[in-house]
Amino acid sequence: MKTKAGFYDYSGNADDKTLSEILARLKASASAKKAPFSPQRLLLAMINEAALCIQEHIATPTDIDIAVLAGIGFPQSRGGILQYADEIGIDVILNQLNELCGVYGERFFPAPLIRRMVAAGFLGKKTKRGFLEHA
């Protein structure tokens, strides 16, 4: 049974002023720059969001990797998005997020967990410790 208390506006009003205002602000903001399609930019955003989920105890790294493998068809050969991040290097991820943050704004601001991992030397496979532990 629907309670009509969720995400959607069930008032029957086709013109949602709140949504229109948000979209207008996004279009006017600097972060709405036109840019060519970049798979790496999408992956970095997903890695950053995954780090926030781990930091907020919403999911474990293993949960996230299984979800992207089963849910969005992430290549099994990569082992999941966090396995992929560990292969690239958490320090490299941090540097790339910082660059994107400078260009596209705060939506690419690196998750505090990523900053702490780099500061602690948890850089991924090259240090045998990242989002996951590596033998």
Predicted features and spans:
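N-terminal glycine-rich phosphate-binding loop for ADP-containing cofactors
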Residues: 1-135
